[in-house]
């Protein structure tokens, strides 16, 4: 039976009067005090011969299990199965194929290297936690888990996600794949229109999908700590109009897309640890409002470009300048006052015939010519 190891564990601790089937718990009646203490037994007043109620939850967490023997239980009646914190290396294909009414499966913190293809038979599965294993990939059949709302695959060795992951999992609300080795996210991920949380930090992401605006319900996006890999964000990121939190910290991003200035619902922006040039780091350190205003003005062409003005010639106000006195062998520097021009003009205009007296090169640079005080 699937609870054989649990029974042996209880025998070692003097709990011989407990039955193996007591690991089957109905949480709707009364929650167990511990994984080893059953809530229902054949002698308990709340015991019900209705097998469908009795076999609602199976909790085998922290039992030091190394394998799962072929169970003789009616697995079709189990709604929740917790096999976390064990030493399990493989999930039998026959097990998942018979869990027809399973809603939640927790196998985190084991030694599993691959999920069975029969996981696609879990058409009612809503919560799947496979974090803390040695998974390199997820089976393509996971797309058949169309009721899935939460997928946690943190702390694995995932190199890629299934290409079709976004085509069928239209009910997925939370996708956590942090602390893996992902280089990119599949393009179909933008089809997850119900997605609210996307956590892809601590990976090797080099690029994000272009059509992020399709994630119309996304509220939290975390792509931080991809370090030397992620150097740019797609402009479509600013079209995530329902986004509340954006974490892009500790990457190689130098420019924030101007479209971020349109994200009026954004409440938190974390961008530290990036070599930002636009907006300047001093703007980022001020506030989220300052960043939004900077990017909005830049997008609308209202941002003052001081660097461009330095390349123009002309005078905006009366200034002091120096000339050399040509009447003496010893050249002495004298300060003179320049002219006030109404606006900036390039040097080719200043040297034209429109300004023959006041601004010709001969008048400007001759050592024997002076401006009056």
Curated annotation (Swiss-Prot):
Give the SMART domains listed for this entry: LRR_BAC, LRR_TYP
Taking the record's annotation, the residue ranges forming a coiled coil are none
> What is one Pfam family matched by this protein?
LRR_8
Q: Which SUPFAM superfamilies match?
A: L domain-like
What are the LRR repeat spans here? 52-75, 76-98, 100-122, 123-145, 147-169, 170-192, 194-215, 216-240, 241-264, 266-286
Q: In which tissues is it expressed?
A: Specifically expressed in flowers.
Q: Which InterPro entries match?
A: Leu-rich_rpt, Leu-rich_rpt_typical-subtyp, LRR-SigEffector_domain, LRR_dom_sf
For region Disordered, the annotated ranges are: 25-49
Taxonomically, the superkingdom here is Eukaryota
Q: Which UniProt keywords apply?
A: Leucine-rich repeat, Repeat
Work out whether the entry's keyword set contains Repeat.
Answer: yes
Q: Which PROSITE patterns match?
A: LRR
Give the residue interval(s) assigned to the motif GVYW: 291-294
Q: Which family does it belong to?
A: Belongs to the SHOC2 family.
List, alphabetically, the PANTHER family matched: LEUCINE-RICH REPEAT AND IQ DOMAIN-CONTAINING PROTEIN 4, LEUCINE-RICH REPEAT-CONTAINING
**Function field:** Leucine-rich repeat protein that likely mediates protein interactions, possibly in the context of signal transduction.
Its name, as the record gives it, is Plant intracellular Ras-group-related LRR protein 7
Q: Which gene encodes it?
A: PIRL7
């Amino acid at each position: 039976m699937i609870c054989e190891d649990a029974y042996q564990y209880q025998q070692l601790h003097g709990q011989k009067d407990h039955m193996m089937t007591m690991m089957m718990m109905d949480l709707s009646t009364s929650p167990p005090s511990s994984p080893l203490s059953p809530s229902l037994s054949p002698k308990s007043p709340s015991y019900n011969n209705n097998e469908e109620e009795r076999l609602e939850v199976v909790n085998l967490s922290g039992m030091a299990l190394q394998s799962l023997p072929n169970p003789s239980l009616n697995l079709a009646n189990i709604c929740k199965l917790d096999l976390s914190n064990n030493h399990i290396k493989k999930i039998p294909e026959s097990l998942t194929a018979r869990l027809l009414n399973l809603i939640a499966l927790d196998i985190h913190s084991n030694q599993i290297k691959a999920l069975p293809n029969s996981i696609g038979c879990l058409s009612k599965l809503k919560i799947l936690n496979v974090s803390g294993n040695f998974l390199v990939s997820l089976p393509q059949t996971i797309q058949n888990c169309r009721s899935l709302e939460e997928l946690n695959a943190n702390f694995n060795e995932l190199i890629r996600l299934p290409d079709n992951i976004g085509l069928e999992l239209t009910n997925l609300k939370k996708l956590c794949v942090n602390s893996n080795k992902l280089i990119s996210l599949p393009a179909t991920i933008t089809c997850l229109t119900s997605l609210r949380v996307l956590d892809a930090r601590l990976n090797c992401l080099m690029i994000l999908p272009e059509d992020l605006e399709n994630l119309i319900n996304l509220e939290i996006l975390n792509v931080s700590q991809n370090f030397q890999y992620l150097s740019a964000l797609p402009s479509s990121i600013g079209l995530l109009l329902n986004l509340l939190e954006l974490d892009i910290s500790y990457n190689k991003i130098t420019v924030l897309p101007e479209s971020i200035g349109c994200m009026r619902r954004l409440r938190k922006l974390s961008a530290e640890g990036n070599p930002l040039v636009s907006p300047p780091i001093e703007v980022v350190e001020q506030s989220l409002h300052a960043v939004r205003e900077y990017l909005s003005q830049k997008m609308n062409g209202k941002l003052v470009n001081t660097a461009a003005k330095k390349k123009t010639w002309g005078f905006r106000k009366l200034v002091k300048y120096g000339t050399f006195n040509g009447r003496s062998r010893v050249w002495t520097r004298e300060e003179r006052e320049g002219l006030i021009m109404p606006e900036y003009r390039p040097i080719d205009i200043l040297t034209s015939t429109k300004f023959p007296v006041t601004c010709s090169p001969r008048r400007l640079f001759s050592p024997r010519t002076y401006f009056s005080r």
